[in-house]
A protein has these predicted regions:
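Conserved beta-strand segments of the P-loop GTPase G domain that flank and frequently precede/overlap
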Residues: 54-55, 83-85, 189, 235-239, ...
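Phosphate/Mg2+-binding loops and adjacent switch elements
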Residues: 138-242, 247-250
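Pre-Walker A (Motif I) flank of P-loop NTPase domains
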Residues: 48-52
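Conserved nucleotide-binding/hydrolysis micro-motifs of P-loop NTPases
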Residues: 87-90, 122-126, 192-195, 240-244, ...
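Extreme N-terminal basic, low-complexity initiation segments
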Residues: 2-13
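C-terminal lobe/tail of nucleotide-utilizing enzymes
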Residues: 28-30, 35-46, 227, 231, ...
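Walker A/P-loop NTP-binding active-site region of P-loop NTPases
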Residues: 55, 60-120, 200-203
Length: 358
């Protein structure tokens, strides 16, 4: 039987399955293999921001990554709010179930030690804005009972995004009596790549119409938060395949155009590559001599993943890392990925008292 020595063991081509151990995934920073300390720096830097926006195309594991980031941060002692921005505010919440939140609505609920959950709501943001702007709460309640006003807020260009932004801003403003932030870190699961851009672009149309006054001030404050790399970071999620990486690289340019700070990129479901360059070359010679084997597809997938990682490294100027492909789903998958992220923090001390500037 043909065999090649790889990473200290014999690998038989016919037995390559593409499955991997979660402990074997590579953390890469700017295209090179990184040590655990590098991973610690990347995650610690993310967790010191006030808002982390997780974006990506559908089906790449964005929601699972959002949950895993929040769970890992909470277990590292960082109070974290996991926020869901859903286009269907009344529908079921997959994210709430992944972290054990008992309800999914505009009210913040506890989901575990150091972990809270909320579903951002445009109507809730509108209500908060009116309460802040009008001289009495009853005036805001009366205004929201107006069907005409509600229809305008629901249909007006950029007004939905303004409501979502204002609720997020209100949550980030909250402080304890001693001045500490109630939510020093908020991880936001965006429903699609376009929503990250919409949060930054559509409110500009409001500013062009109302540059001053309470509306203009609120929108400007929200944009200042989203575009400040010290307080906000975008994490792009993709898969190690040609098309998803191409879409991600296109989004990198769009984020730059609207001023949203990209902080990291994640290649999800990375297959394990057990081969060194030398053993891979030896295997290719064997395949050329003896023809295809049952592991041919898995080898081709490894090559696609390698090329995808190289393309991503060449196309982004921020740290990126791989998350392993696991035979798990739901809460079990989130738990294992959170453990994987936590392993990158070994040897790095978190300082919960240090926070980004407001």
């Amino acid at each position: 039987m043909l065999g090649v020595r790889a990473a200290g063991r014999t690998v038989v081509p016919g037995r390559i399955t593409g499955r991997l151990s979660w402990r074997a995934s590579l953390l890469t920073v700017k295209g090179r293999a990184a040590c655990a300390e590098d991973g610690s720096v990347v995650l610690d830097s993310l967790w010191r921001r006030r808002a982390v926006l997780v974006s990506g195309k559908g089906g790449v594991g964005k929601t699972t990554l959002s949950a895993a980031l929040a769970v890992a941060a909470a277990r590292a002692g960082r109070p974290v709010l996991l926020a869901e921005l859903s286009p269907d505010e009344g529908g079921p919440s997959a994210l709430a179930g992944l972290v054990g939140a008992n309800e999914a609505g505009p009210r913040v609920v506890a989901a575990g030690p150091n972990l809270s959950f909320v579903r951002l709501s445009a109507p809730e943001g509108h209500r908060l804005f009116l309460e802040e702007t009008l001289p009495a709460k009853w005036l805001a309640d009366a205004a929201l009972r107006s069907k005409a006003l509600r229809r305008f807020l629901e249909a007006g260009p950029a007004l939905k995004e303004m409501g979502l932004m204002f609720q997020l801003l209100s949550l980030l403003r909250r402080k304890h009596a001693d001045g500490r932030w109630v939510h020093p870190l908020t991880v936001v699961d965006l429903p699609a790549t376009g929503h990250a851009l919409a949060l930054a672009t559509l409110p500009r149309s409001i500013l062009s119409l109302m540059p001053g006054g309470p509306v203009g001030r609120a929108v400007r404050e929200g944009l200042d938060l989203l575009q400040d790399p010290a307080r906000t970071g975008v994490v792009l999620t993709t898969l190690p395949e040609p098309l998803p990486v191409s879409e991600t690289l296109a989004l990198v340019g769009e984020l730059k155009d609207v001023g949203l700070p990209l902080s990291a990129a994640v290649l999800n479901r990375m297959p394990e590559d057990p081969f060194t360059p030398e053993s891979r070359a030896a295997l290719e010679r064997l395949l050329e001599t003896h023809g295809p084997h049952r592991g041919q597809r898995a080898l081709e997938r490894l090559e696609r993943a390698r090329q995808a990682r190289q393309r991503l490294a060449a196309g982004v100027a921020v740290p990126h890392w791989g998350l392993p492909e696991l035979a798990l789903t739901g809460v079990a998958l989130v738990e294992r990925l959170a453990e994987h992220l936590m392993s990158k923090l070994e040897g790095a001390a978190l300082h919960p008292g240090q926070e980004a500037t407001p």
